Regions:
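C-terminal globular interaction/adhesion domains in large, modular proteins
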Residues: 1-173, 180-204, 208, 215-293
């Protein structure tokens, strides 16, 4: 944990763990403790298998490449995207709704790369959406890249993007528009788990808010580098309310001033006792004493 709120934390001193680190209780109310135990992202493999089973049995599993043939658990069975250029060749776009449902469209084309990096932005998609109820167990599993936005109200869902092979594939989750709760007292919860990266794309909103607990299993949470020759190379503000777990270094901005100028990261305390459905954790909180005055 490091802070740039004045006075800035000292630079790393070469020791592991660092020595003579100031307490900074004004920023870290519970203090700072070094070192922390390493948690391997490989431990998620078993969780992903469980999510797949839950989606297949009583949740929703979308497999555009299989289209209900090679993967009989997939819905809808009339979605044929196996051929290049198919209706969901690039992935799926989900818009969550406030009536405990969601709209889903196949994404057929994305904007071209810029500065040698993927735009992670939709150029064309199906005009008509298909609408589904959020399943009772809250699990939605997509076997392709996902774009997601919208707003929920009294809903809870964990949504995963994992392509074949499940261990070693490269599906991403892209966040280019607001993804919001209505209730901020714990009734609403969204979990997002990406096989690789969780991105804010080149054409992401100038001001964007994402309410979710987010995991990037093998990649990073952030935004690709887009130089000054790219459209939207500078964005204003991104706010994430929830939690971040990223295998590689997080970042929505770069040292040359590109990317999001303001990054607000706010931990959702309700995740402690009311996480999204079946969301992975490394343990549970316990009360060791209680004192009423």
């Amino acid at each position: 944990m490091h802070t740039h709120l004045p006075p800035l934390d000292p630079l790393p001193d070469g020791n592991n763990p660092p020595q003579n680190v100031p307490e900074r209780s004004d920023v870290f109310a519970a203090g700072r403790s070094f070192p922390s135990n390493i948690v391997s992202f490989d431990l998620l493999d078993n969780h992903i298998n469980i999510f797949y089973q839950l989606a297949s049995s009583s949740g929703l599993l979308f497999d555009g490449a299989a289209a209900g043939a090679a993967d009989p658990d997939s819905v809808p069975d009339y979605w044929g995207c196996a051929a290049p250029g198919g209706a969901c060749d690039e992935g799926f776009h989900i818009t969550l709704r406030s009536d405990n449902r969601f709209d889903i469209r196949g994404v057929s084309q994305v904007y071209p790369d810029c500065s040698g990096n993927k735009s992670n932005s939709i150029l064309s998609q199906e005009a008509a959406a298909r609408t589904y109820d959020i399943p009772a167990n809250g699990i939605i599993f997509l076997k392709n890249t996902l774009w997601i936005d919208g707003q929920i109200n009294n809903s809870r869902a964990t949504i995963l993007a994992f392509a074949e092979p499940i261990v070693g594939g490269e599906a991403d989750i892209n966040l280019n528009n607001d993804l919001l709760y209505t209730d901020y007292e714990g009734a609403d919860a969204i979990g997002l788990i990406a096989q690789r990266d969780v991105n804010a794309g080149q054409y992401s909103a100038d001001i964007i808010r994402v309410d979710a607990a987010i995991i990037a299993k093998t990649g990073r949470i952030g935004r690709n580098y887009y130089g000054s020759a790219c459209a939207n190379y500078i964005r204003s503000t991104i706010t994430i309310y929830g939690s971040l777990a990223t295998s590689q270094r997080y970042g929505f901005a770069y040292t040359d001033g590109t990317g999001y100028q303001i990054r607000n990261l706010i931990y959702d305390n309700h995740l402690t006792f009311s996480p999204p459905p079946h969301y992975p954790s490394t343990g549970e909180y316990t009360f060791i004493s209680w004192d009423e005055k």
